[in-house]
C-alpha cells in the first residue's frame, strides 16, 4: 500500500504521479502539484488556491500553529520550500526560494531565485524581493505584471470555485521505501524505522531505530563510502545525502534535517537541527546540539563546536545555545506516523 494515495470526490486539481500528499489539504480548481512535490499537512493546515502551482521537487509543510495558505494563480518554481508561510494571489516565487514559518507575502509579490524569507517576515503587496538575507529590489511595475500575465496565458482573474478537500493519511505498507544494493553492500534499516514510499536508499547505509526518512529523500552510499544514520533521526522531504570517494557521512542520534536540504560527507553531532534547504559540505563537522539555519552552507572541512548557531553562505557561527535545540515544529510528531510493517527482505 502506498503513502501517496489521494481520496477525493471531485478532482478539480492535478497531482502528478510522483507527487506526495500527506494529511489533509485543500486544493483549488486547476491547482497543480508537479512531479516530485511533497505537501505535508498536519490537521488540515495547508491550502493551495485556484490555479496555483508548485513546480518540480517543491515542498510545502503546514501545521495548526503555522498553516500554509497560498492564494490564487501563484506559482512556485522548482525546489521551492514553503514551511508554515502564507502567500497572496498572483505571486511569482523563484526556483529554490525558502519561506520560513510565520512569514507572509502580500498579493503580486515576486521573489528572485534562492530568496530566503525569514521567520515572521511580512512582505507588502507588489514587492520584488531578492537575496539571502532578502532585500527589497523595488515595487512591481506594470511591465512585471504584464510579464506575469503572459506567463499565465493572460488569465489573471480570481475565481470563486470552492476547491476540494483531499485526505491522504500515511499508510504503512510492507514495501515502505525503495532499497537498492550496490555491489556487495545493501542498506540495513532498523525494524522501527519509517521510510516513506518515495524515499530511496542505496548501498552501504545503516539507519537506526525509530528514524524517519521522509518522502522523496535520496540516501546514496555507493562506491564512495558508508552512510551511518543514528537512532530517532528525521530526514525530511526531498533531502539528498551523498558523499565523495574515501569519505563517510555520519548523522548521530536525534538529528533533525529539514526538507530540501543537501547533506554531503560530513559529521553531524547528536541533537543537531539542520533547517530547511541548508547545505552541509564534505569533510565538515558540526558539534552536538547545534543549529544550521535555513539556506546556510557549511563549507568543506569547516569545524564547529557543540551548540553552535550557524548561518550564512558560507556559514559562520552567529551564536551559541545554552541548551539543545529540541525538535522543531515542522518535524514529524511520532503520533502522526503509521505503525510500520517489517521491511521486505
Specify the residue positions occupied by each region the protein language model found.
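The right-handed parallel beta-helix/beta-solenoid scaffold, focusing on the short coil/turn
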Residues: 11, 17, 23, 29, ...
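Active-site beta-loop-alpha junctions enriched in small/polar residues
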Residues: 240
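Glycine-rich hexapeptide-repeat left-handed beta-helix
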Residues: 1-10, 42, 48, 56-70, ...
Amino acid at each position: 500500500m502506498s503513502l501517496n494515495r489521494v481520496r477525493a470526490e471531485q478532482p478539480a486539481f492535478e497531482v502528478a504521479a510522483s507527487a506526495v500528499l500527506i494529511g489533509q489539504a485543500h486544493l483549488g480548481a486547476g491547482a497543480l502539484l508537479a512531479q516530485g512535490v511533497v505537501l505535508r499537512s498536519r490537521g488540515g493546515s495547508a491550502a493551495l488556491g485556484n490555479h496555483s502551482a508548485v513546480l518540480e521537487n517543491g515542498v510545502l509543510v503546514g501545521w495548526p500553529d503555522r498553516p500554509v495558505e497560498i492564494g490564487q494563480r501563484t506559482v512556485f518554481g522548482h525546489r521551492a520550500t514553503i514551511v508554515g508561510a502564507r502567500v497572496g494571489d498572483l505571486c511569482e516565487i523563484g526556483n529554490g526560494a525558502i519561506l520560513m514559518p510565520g512569514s507572509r507575502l502580500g498579493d503580486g509579490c515576486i521573489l528572485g531565485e534562492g530568496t530566503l524569507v525569514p521567520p515572521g517576515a511580512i512582505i507588502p503587496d507588489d514587492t520584488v524581493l531578492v537575496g539571502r538575507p532578502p532585500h527589497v529590489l523595488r515595487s512591481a511595475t506594470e511591465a512585471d505584471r504584464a510579464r506575469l500575465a503572459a506567463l499565465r496565458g493572460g488569465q489573471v482573474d480570481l475565481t470563486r470555485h470552492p476547491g476540494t478537500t483531499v485526505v491522504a493519511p500515511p499508510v504503512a505498507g510492507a514495501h515502505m521505501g525503495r532499497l537498492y544494493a550496490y555491489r556487495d553492500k545493501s542498506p540495513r534499516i532498523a525494524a522501527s524505522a519509517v521510510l516513506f514510499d518515495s524515499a530511496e536508499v542505496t548501498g552501504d547505509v545503516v539507519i537506526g531505530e525509530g528514524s524517519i526518512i521522509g518522502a522523496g529523500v535520496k540516501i546514496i552510499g555507493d562506491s564512495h563510502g558508508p552512510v551511518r544514520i543514528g537512532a530517532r533521526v528525521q530526514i525530511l522531504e526531498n533531502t539528498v545525502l551523498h558523499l565523495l570517494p574515501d569519505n563517510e557521512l555520519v548523522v548521530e542520534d536525534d538529528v533533525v534535517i529539514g526538507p530540501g536540504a543537501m547533506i554531503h560527507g560530513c559529521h553531524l553531532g547528536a541533537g543537531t537541527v539542520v533547517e530547511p534547504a541548508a547545505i552541509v559540505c564534505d569533510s565538515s563537522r558540526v558539534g552536538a546540539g547545534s543549529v544550521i539555519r535555513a539556506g546556510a552552507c557549511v563549507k568543506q572541512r569547516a569545524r564547529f563546536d557543540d551548540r553552535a548557531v550557524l548561518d550564512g553562505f558560507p556559514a559562520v557561527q552567529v551564536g551559541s545555545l545554552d541548551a539543545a535545540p529540541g525538535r522543531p515544529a515542522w518535524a514529524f510528531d511520532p503520533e502522526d506516523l503509521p505503525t510500520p510493517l517489517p521491511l521486505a527482505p
